[in-house]
Curated annotation (Swiss-Prot):
Note: Negative results: does not affect blood coagulation and does not show significant hemolytic activity.
PROSITE patterns documented for this protein: SNAKE_TOXIN
Function: Acts as a beta-blocker by binding to beta-1 and beta-2 adrenergic receptors (ADRB1 and ADRB2). It dose-dependently decreases the heart rate (bradycardia), whereas conventional cardiotoxins increases it. At 100 mg/kg, intraperitoneal injection into mice provokes labored breathing, impaired locomotion, lack of response to external stimuli, and death (after 30 minutes).
Pfam families reported in the protein's UniProt record: Toxin_cobra-type
Tissue: Expressed by the venom gland.
Highest taxon listed in the record's lineage: Eukaryota
Cysteines joined through disulfide linkages: C24-C43, C36-C61, C65-C76, C77-C82
Protein name (database record): Beta-cardiotoxin CTX21
Localization terms from the record: Secreted
Main location: secreted
Gene3D superfamilies: CD59
Organism, scientific name: Ophiophagus hannah
Gene Ontology annotations for the cellular component aspect, listed alphabetically: extracellular region
CDD domains to which the protein is assigned, alphabetical: TFP_snake_toxin
Amino acid sequence: MKTLLLTLVVVTIVCLDLGYTRKCLNTPLPLIYTTCPIGQDKCVKMTIKKLPSKYDVIRGCTDICPKSSADVVVVCCDTNKCNK
């Protein structure tokens, strides 16, 4: 019986995804997020200036933080749900 239990524990550990995956917001709402694909371990928030008083905000996962420009402000971070 103990052998069977030990075998089940080992199989469970092997079958679980023990790798770390980042969780990033993909909307302004804090309860809605996405689990990032393997290799994308940063969260990003891009604010895109459309008109003098209108902005689009894009949130999600990335592997490399894009550079900001005159019309796009990029903020990257390395913790879960940090791209508020």
